[in-house]
Structures are given as C-alpha cells and as structure tokens.
Amino acid sequence: MNVTTAIPSRNSRLSYDRARLAACAQAIIAAGRKLGAQGLTPATSSNFSMRLDSSHAAVTVSGRDKGALTPDDIMVVDMGGNAVGSSARPSAETLLHTHIYQRFADANAVLHTHSRTQTVASRLFAPAGHVSLDGYELLKVFAGQTTHETHIDVPVFPNTQHMPELVERVDAWIRADKPLYGYLIDGHGIYTWGRDMAEAERHIEAFEFLLGCELDLRRLKS
C-alpha cells in the first residue's frame, strides 16, 4: 500500500456524499454479517470503517453487535475521530482507523476483529513483538507479494486505552519503512485494511488462517 504523510483533522462541518455513506453502510453491514457468522466478532467486539472522502470516514457506532448492524449503527467521523452530524459515540478505537486512512492513500476499508485465534496469537507472540510468516502460499493475497518465497512480520503492539499512544507505536513501524499489512494488539485482536471492503475481508481471512497455522505448528512442536 502507498504510504503518505499524516494529514491534520479537517473541520467536521465539511459536507460529505450521502450516497457514498449509504453505500459504505451497506458494505459494512454485509461485512459484519459475514465475519460475525465466522465467529470473528464475539459479543459486541470489533469495529469496521470505510473511507468516505479525504476528510471523512463511516465507522461503526460503539457497542453494537457487528453481526446485526443496521444503517443506524454506522456514523460519520472526521479524520480526527470526531463525530460529524451525530450525537452517537464512535468506537473508542476510531483514531486507529483514521490513522490508517491518513497513512495509506489507497486504504478505503479497515476491519478490526477479535477471534480466538487472533487473540491467542497476540498473547503468545507479544514477547517477540511480532509474528513471522514465512513460505506460505497464502501470503500472495497481500499486494506486492508474488511468491510463497517471501516473509512478512505482523507486529504485536502492547494494548492501551490511550489511543494516541497506540497510534504512535503503529506510526513508528511505518516510519521505519517496514511493510505493514495488518497488526495485532496484545490480548485484543487484529487490524487490517484494503483498497475496498472485499480486499479487507480477504486480508482478515488470510490472517486468520495464517495465524492459525502458526499456533498449530507451535502445538505440534511442543
């Protein structure tokens, strides 16, 4: 994905395309149903978003069941994570979504899920700070990867309720010119993104499979 420099939050009064919002809401709702059916969004965990334009994103309202979303469960925020035209409360982790949109110009959908596999992997690999994925055919799902003879590291960042601190940790990884297709948060889950919702869903499915393989290998070797 193309990395850009961070941009400041825009005025929340700027207009956005209502038709684009409606289309994004439907894509987010469909993703929630699909991922919920796969067991990736237990309870009211997880959060999803899509870019509306350079200044706004559509994001899930905090505390909603992601497998049973309606258009009323999708709201608009600016790139500073502030609600636009709504008294609803966006996900507490909205800044992680807007950070991705600011840093990756071609990211148009962000998914964060909490599967058992993702959560266990985040705990197991937290001391190392990353999960190393080598030699998997499925790595070719990520843009720019054309062979199984490749290696990517999935960083595992310490969990915190202070989102600016977590944003800075992610940004430090990007500034170090390390490839980034997604990241884990210790004891929490995974963030990944795509040029559209379909690609973001493929990335979630790929990470779920690859992390499961790494956990199985650990068990078999023990």
Label for each model-derived stretch:
Residues 2-222:
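Glycine-rich flexible loops
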